[in-house]
A protein has these predicted regions:
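Conserved acidic/glycine
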Residues: 1-56, 254, 258-300
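Short, cationic motifs built from Arg/Lys/His that form the positively charged side of catalytic pockets
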Residues: 15-18, 75, 228, 248
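Residue-level recognition of short, well-ordered coil/turn positions
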Residues: 16-19, 28-29, 68, 174, ...
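Intrinsically disordered or highly flexible coil/loop and linker segments, enriched in small
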Residues: 17-21, 100, 104, 235-239, ...
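Short acidic, gly/pro-rich beta-turn/loop elements at beta-sheet edges
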Residues: 21, 80-82, 188, 252
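Cofactor-binding active-site loop characterized by glycine-rich and histidine/acidic residues
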Residues: 30-172, 193-196, 201-208
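Glycine-rich ThDP/TPP pyrophosphate-binding loop and its adjacent helix/strand module
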Residues: 118-300
Length: 300
């Protein structure tokens, strides 16, 4: 099991980045109508925050090596940070600066850092799936000791690339982990009414892919499940799928007030916050000083 303090450090680092990015993009109004700043917006364009979903990125990426490859989604800041990307270069990219990862021309949804195996976020739903499968096939052809990981949302399972990617991965027995971050909301609409039949786990199982469903707000549960699946992939067992049930705390984009959501559902999601849960565990274990140090470091 990966050290809980290390997992907490990654989660807090992601949350601090998302909080700063949110304020920079708001023009004074934070999600849910709360005042964030009286300064004008410094980040333009859509900004999809992963606030609330940190445990999935932290738990999975804790088991990845530098040579492992990763593809992400439009909500990809957490994955990118957890894979080892530089937070300053990421923020510069959001600000449109030449010192950003893409020279300030890609923005939030297209950040990539090949030096740490981050092949890129993607503004098209489900588009990262075939990219990850192609990367995995490349690793296998070259005989490299590495795997590919693909993060995608629950809305992606209703798009063609999802089934195509799973099929290809099974046919060619590829070293790829599919990670479904299921926050049960596709943009501004509940996913369930738009989904016929079973979800990601059952669809993967129908193709012979072993799948595990886990509480995506519990970073220890995510880490344990992801670690086992990744070990199986590394030993030649073929593709695997992790279905993480998680919560999106914010609107679809940073300026979205989320009024289409039931306030009770939002409060329930906030009450399940993985960071708060992990903090409480660590404090109970006597790690208050380390927790506070991690939190101070995340703000710098």
């Amino acid at each position: 099991m990966t050290d809980l303090l290390s997992l907490y450090r990654t989660m807090v680092r992601i949350r601090a980045f998302e909080d700063a990015a949110e304020i920079a993009s708001q023009g004074g109004v934070a999600a849910w109508g709360k005042q964030a700043s009286d300064k004008p917006a410094l980040v333009r364009g859509p900004l999809h925050l992963s606030t609330g979903q940190e445990a999935v990125a932290a738990g999975v990426c804790a088991h990845l090596k530098p040579a492992d490859l990763l593809t992400s989604t439009h909500r990809g800041h957490g994955h990118t940070l957890a894979k080892g990307a530089d937070a300053t270069k990421m923020m510069c990219e959001l600000f449109g600066r030449a010192t950003g990862y893409n020279g300030g021309k890609g923005g939030s949804m297209h950040i990539a850092d090949f030096s740490v195996g981050m092949l890129g976020a993607n503004g098209v739903v489900a588009a990262g799936l075939p990219i990850a499968v192609g990367a995995a096939q490349g690793l296998k052809i070259r005989g490299q000791d590495a795997i590919a990981v693909c993060f995608f949302g629950d809305g992606a399972i209703n798009r063609g690339p999802f089934m195509e990617a799973l099929n290809w991965a099974v046919v060619y027995h590829l070293p790829v982990l599919f990670v479904c971050e299921d926050n049960r909301i596709s943009a501004t609409t509940a996913s369930a009414p738009m989904t016929a039949g079973p979800g990601a786990s059952a669809r993967a199982a129908s193709m012979g892919i072993a799948a595990v469903q886990v509480d995506g707000t519990d970073v220890q549960a995510v880490s344990q499940a992801a670690g086992e699946l990744i070990r199986e992939i590394r030993t030649g067992s073929g593709p695997r799928l992790l279905h993480a049930l998680t919560d999106r705390h914010k609107g679809h984009v940073s300026v979205d007030p989320g009024t289409y959501r039931d306030p009770k559902d939002v409060q329930a999601a906030l009450a399940r916050d993985g960071i708060a849960r992990t903090r409480a565990q660590l404090v109970a274990q006597g790690h208050t000083a380390q927790v506070e140090q991690i939190e101070r470091e995340a703000q710098t």
